[in-house]
């Protein structure tokens, strides 16, 4: 039986749709087990320990610079310390603990977190992606589980309808998502700079002759080593992260208890929030400005959510409440107690408050902790960009998977070079942690605010929470983050401009790439080749059937791409087995190999002059790794034979079940076709790719011509080529040039 495809997407009977899928019972595949999803308490404790090294390096090293950034001009009143300590404690409780640990972590996408995970979660419940490549079979992927809005809660259905019908809403959600990604990239630039510089600055306590410039160059040397080692990944040294950060937490907690006992235990009254009110009454605008330093105590909080895929919710909740919060709270309280007696040392509080015998051990662990914090932030930045790349939101770059044991550990050489150069430049330009902190805070709070807005959509659309709770969530966290952001923006001219400029450039690149990507897809979709024209092309006298298997890649998941007629015109030959191949990334973290492919027959041997034409969509999640070309082709052809077999079984089941001769003929034809596929595979596989030159159509605006003809073209020519991303051997590659005017 031959299922013809007329080029345009058309509704199909349910039974036919089921048959057209490669795996008839894909919906029966059990949901993939996430790493650390559930399990025994022993396993949870193990994951909680491991998470200490991966998740908390950044927030755990914040005590190195929070007080110096909060009081850049010194402490004017002794009780200001109590007010700031109270702000620090309640900021730690409100945002990392209440918001992230006990609310946001539950909005994960099959165990994965982060800004893109929230966006993909929303996009599965409402069609907000701008590329129309949704297919009915996608819902059968086990990780694609969704809960339709309840009929009892019309609000969720109303929100869904508004999101799907409003281009402005789609663009707004996409914009804040790429803004969050851009800010995380800024975070990846500033975290190494501020963490390493603040840790190295402590050496001046024992070597006072060192100038600040020399400290900066020592920091630059460490940064150079850090970024040079990224290509090796964290797999080989990752096992040391948790012990080192655990030792760090024990040290800062112990030193904090020591300072509390020796200097002023009464600083514990900071748990009374009235001291926050007194602090603002006493200092007014200066107290508001100081919030930009206070917020640095929660840098790295987003990592708890972004790195969720490697752990589980219980593990992170346990490690935060039992290890991180007590340790850093004791550290901040101890520093405040020390500063009550020695307020003149606020510029270097951390190292001045360390008992003399512990200085060198703490200094060494601080350097290691700063490097680990930087490494964790960089790994997270690479992972987020990898997700953006798979969803068509970032230009093609090389993604190197650095671990065979742990998924999600990737390294992107081009991005590593740019972030490394930017981090070194920031360190050399700003010189002090106080100046870098002005820029750092903007990245941190902007990501917090974006998560709050996306979480509000999740609550409305997916969780279907009662409105009073949603209003309370948005008001509490939205107001707090607005206050912090407004404070940081007051330092725009003192370094706050840096992440804005960085993010604007990165957003412009991402938006340009995605805009042309969408326009190109629509251009191809509007010009799909009808099945009748395909059959006519194959029937031409000058078109020869050549041995082997041809895989023609395009982004279309429905219809024959317009590059095919051009290929036949230029090279009047078609392979005996020809597959129109599409690589599609679903808004889910992973797709099981058993659910990878969807096949449809385009033209059978009887109608195609001996050619066998198929369409295939290979589906991947945004954390999945593409196989090498050889392995991919072998797996593809193996599953193609399964499809041929299932097609014959389905054809027999629709006919007269008593006609044994017909069944035998159908089975014999299927066996013959499988033999043909094997024989042609032995003759070799050729990969064909359309090399599209995209230009702005005549009459386009000046801005569109600049974006398409210059910016996009520059990106496309200077970044990774498509065949390299698919690991296609050059001796098996054939490119077909074509021009699209969009």
Swiss-Prot record:
<keyword id="KW-1133">Transmembrane helix</keyword>
<feature type="topological domain" description="Extracellular">
    <location>
        <begin position="339"/>
        <end position="352"/>
    </location>
</feature>
<feature type="topological domain" description="Cytoplasmic">
    <location>
        <begin position="105"/>
        <end position="170"/>
    </location>
</feature>
<feature type="glycosylation site" description="N-linked (GlcNAc...) asparagine">
    <location>
        <position position="259"/>
    </location>
</feature>
<dbReference type="Pfam" id="PF02705">
    <property type="entry name" value="K_trans"/>
</dbReference>
<dbReference type="InterPro" id="IPR003855">
    <property type="entry name" value="K+_transporter"/>
</dbReference>
<dbReference type="InterPro" id="IPR053951">
    <property type="entry name" value="K_trans_N"/>
</dbReference>
<feature type="transmembrane region" description="Helical; Name=4">
    <location>
        <begin position="207"/>
        <end position="227"/>
    </location>
</feature>
<dbReference type="InterPro" id="IPR053952">
    <property type="entry name" value="K_trans_C"/>
</dbReference>
<keyword id="KW-0325">Glycoprotein</keyword>
<feature type="transmembrane region" description="Helical; Name=2">
    <location>
        <begin position="84"/>
        <end position="104"/>
    </location>
</feature>
<feature type="topological domain" description="Cytoplasmic">
    <location>
        <begin position="1"/>
        <end position="46"/>
    </location>
</feature>
<feature type="topological domain" description="Extracellular">
    <location>
        <begin position="68"/>
        <end position="83"/>
    </location>
</feature>
<comment type="function">
    <text>High-affinity potassium transporter.</text>
</comment>
<feature type="topological domain" description="Extracellular">
    <location>
        <begin position="192"/>
        <end position="206"/>
    </location>
</feature>
<dbReference type="GO" id="GO:0015079">
    <property type="term" value="F:potassium ion transmembrane transporter activity"/>
</dbReference>
<keyword id="KW-0406">Ion transport</keyword>
<feature type="topological domain" description="Cytoplasmic">
    <location>
        <begin position="374"/>
        <end position="409"/>
    </location>
</feature>
<feature type="transmembrane region" description="Helical; Name=1">
    <location>
        <begin position="47"/>
        <end position="67"/>
    </location>
</feature>
<feature type="transmembrane region" description="Helical; Name=3">
    <location>
        <begin position="171"/>
        <end position="191"/>
    </location>
</feature>
<comment type="similarity">
    <text>Belongs to the HAK/KUP transporter (TC 2.A.72.3) family.</text>
</comment>
<feature type="transmembrane region" description="Helical; Name=6">
    <location>
        <begin position="288"/>
        <end position="308"/>
    </location>
</feature>
<feature type="transmembrane region" description="Helical; Name=8">
    <location>
        <begin position="353"/>
        <end position="373"/>
    </location>
</feature>
<feature type="transmembrane region" description="Helical; Name=10">
    <location>
        <begin position="442"/>
        <end position="462"/>
    </location>
</feature>
<feature type="topological domain" description="Cytoplasmic">
    <location>
        <begin position="463"/>
        <end position="468"/>
    </location>
</feature>
<dbReference type="GO" id="GO:0006813">
    <property type="term" value="P:potassium ion transport"/>
</dbReference>
<keyword id="KW-0630">Potassium</keyword>
<feature type="topological domain" description="Extracellular">
    <location>
        <begin position="431"/>
        <end position="441"/>
    </location>
</feature>
<feature type="topological domain" description="Cytoplasmic">
    <location>
        <begin position="228"/>
        <end position="236"/>
    </location>
</feature>
<feature type="transmembrane region" description="Helical; Name=12">
    <location>
        <begin position="496"/>
        <end position="516"/>
    </location>
</feature>
<protein>
    <recommendedName>
        <fullName>Potassium transporter 19</fullName>
    </recommendedName>
</protein>
<keyword id="KW-0633">Potassium transport</keyword>
<feature type="topological domain" description="Cytoplasmic">
    <location>
        <begin position="517"/>
        <end position="742"/>
    </location>
</feature>
<dbReference type="Pfam" id="PF22776">
    <property type="entry name" value="K_trans_C"/>
</dbReference>
<feature type="topological domain" description="Cytoplasmic">
    <location>
        <begin position="309"/>
        <end position="317"/>
    </location>
</feature>
<feature type="topological domain" description="Extracellular">
    <location>
        <begin position="258"/>
        <end position="287"/>
    </location>
</feature>
<feature type="topological domain" description="Extracellular">
    <location>
        <begin position="490"/>
        <end position="495"/>
    </location>
</feature>
<feature type="transmembrane region" description="Helical; Name=9">
    <location>
        <begin position="410"/>
        <end position="430"/>
    </location>
</feature>
<keyword id="KW-0812">Transmembrane</keyword>
<feature type="transmembrane region" description="Helical; Name=5">
    <location>
        <begin position="237"/>
        <end position="257"/>
    </location>
</feature>
<keyword id="KW-0472">Membrane</keyword>
<dbReference type="GO" id="GO:0016020">
    <property type="term" value="C:membrane"/>
</dbReference>
């Amino acid at each position: 039986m031959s299922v013809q495809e007329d080029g345009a997407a058309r509704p199909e009977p349910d039974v036919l749709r089921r048959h057209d899928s490669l795996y008839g019972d894909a919906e029966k595949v059990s949901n993939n087990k996430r790493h650390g999803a559930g399990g025994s308490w022993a396993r949870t404790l193990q994951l909680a320990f491991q998470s200490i090294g991966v998740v908390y390096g950044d927030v755990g090293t914040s005590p190195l610079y929070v007080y110096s950034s909060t009081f850049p001009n010194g402490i004017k009143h002794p009780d200001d310390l109590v007010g700031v300590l109270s702000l620090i404690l309640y900021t730690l409780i409100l945002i990392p603990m209440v918001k992230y640990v006990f609310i946001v972590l539950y909005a994960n996408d099959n165990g994965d977190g982060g800004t893109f995970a929230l966006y993909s979660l929303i996009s599965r419940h409402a069609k907000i992606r701008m590329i129309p490549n949704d297919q009915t079979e996608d819902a059968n992927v086990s990780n694609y589980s969704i809960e339709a809005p309840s009929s009892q809660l019309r609000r969720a259905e109303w929100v869904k309808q508004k999101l799907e019908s409003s281009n402005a809403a789609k663009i707004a959600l996409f914009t804040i998502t790429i803004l969050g990604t851009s800010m995380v990239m800024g975070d990846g630039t500033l975290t190494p700079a501020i963490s390493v510089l603040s840790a190295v600055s402590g050496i001046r306590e024992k070597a006072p002759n060192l100038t600040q410039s020399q400290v900066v160059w020592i920091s630059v040397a460490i940064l150079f080593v850090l970024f040079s080692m990224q290509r090796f990944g964290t797999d080989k040294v990752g096992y040391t992260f948790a012990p080192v950060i655990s030792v760090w937490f024990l040290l800062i907690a112990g030193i904090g208890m020591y300072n509390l006992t020796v200097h002023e235990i009464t600083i514990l009254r900071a748990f009374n929030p009235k001291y926050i009110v007194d602090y603002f009454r006493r200092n007014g605008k200066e107290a508001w400005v100081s919030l930009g330093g206070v917020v640095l105590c929660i840098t790295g909080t987003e990592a708890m959510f972004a790195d969720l895929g490697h752990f589980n919710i219980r593990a992170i909740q346990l490690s935060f409440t039992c290890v991180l919060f007590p340790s850093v709270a004791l550290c901040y309280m101890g520093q405040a107690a020390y500063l009550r007696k020695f307020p003149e040392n606020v510029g270097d509080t951390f190292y001045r408050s360390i008992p003399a015998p512990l200085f060198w051990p703490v200094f060494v662990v601080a350097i290691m902790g700063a490097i680990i914090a930087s490494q964790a932030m960089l790994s997270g930045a690479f992972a987020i960009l990898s997700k953006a790349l798979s969803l068509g939101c970032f230009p093609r770059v090389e993604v190197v998977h650095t671990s065979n044991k742990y998924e999600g550990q990737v390294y992107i050489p081009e991005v590593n070079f740019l972030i490394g150069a930017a981090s070194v430049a920031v360190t050399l330009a700003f010189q002090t942690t106080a100046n870098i902190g002005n820029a750092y805070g903007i990245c941190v709070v902007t990501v917090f605010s974006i998560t709050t807005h996306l979480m509000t959509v999740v609550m409305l659309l997916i969780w279907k929470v009662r409105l009073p709770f949603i209003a309370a969530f948005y008001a509490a966290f939205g107001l707090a983050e607005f206050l912090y952001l407004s404070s940081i923006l007051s330092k725009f001219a003192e370094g706050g401009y840096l992440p804005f400029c960085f993010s604007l450039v990165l957003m412009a690149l991402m938006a340009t790439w995605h805009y042309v990507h969408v326009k190109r897809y629509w251009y191809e979709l509007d010009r799909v080749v009808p099945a009748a024209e395909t059959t006519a092309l194959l029937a031409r006298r000058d078109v020869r059937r050549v041995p082997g298997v041809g895989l023609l890649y395009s982004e279309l998941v429905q219809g024959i791409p317009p590059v095919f007629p051009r290929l036949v015109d230029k090279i009047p030959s078609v392979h005996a087995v020809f597959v129109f191949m599409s690589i599609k990334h679903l808004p889910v973290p992973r797709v099981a190999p058993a659910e990878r492919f969807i096949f449809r027959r385009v033209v059978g041997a009887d109608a195609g002059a001996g050619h066998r034409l198929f369409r295939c969509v290979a589906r991947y999640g945004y954390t999945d790794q593409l196989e090498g070309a050889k392995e991919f082709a072998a797996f593809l052809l193996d599953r193609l034979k399964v499809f041929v077999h299932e097609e014959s079984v389905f054809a027999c089941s629709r006919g007269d079940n008593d006609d044994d001769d017909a069944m035998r003929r159908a089975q014999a034809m299927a066996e013959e076709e499988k033999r043909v596929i094997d024989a042609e595979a032995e003759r070799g596989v050729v990969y064909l790719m359309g090399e599209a030159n995209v230009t702005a159509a005549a009459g386009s605006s000046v801005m569109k011509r600049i974006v398409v003809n210059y910016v996009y073209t520059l990106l496309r020519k200077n970044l990774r080529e498509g065949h390299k991303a698919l690991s296609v051997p050059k001796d098996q590659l054939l490119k077909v040039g074509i021009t699209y005017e969009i």
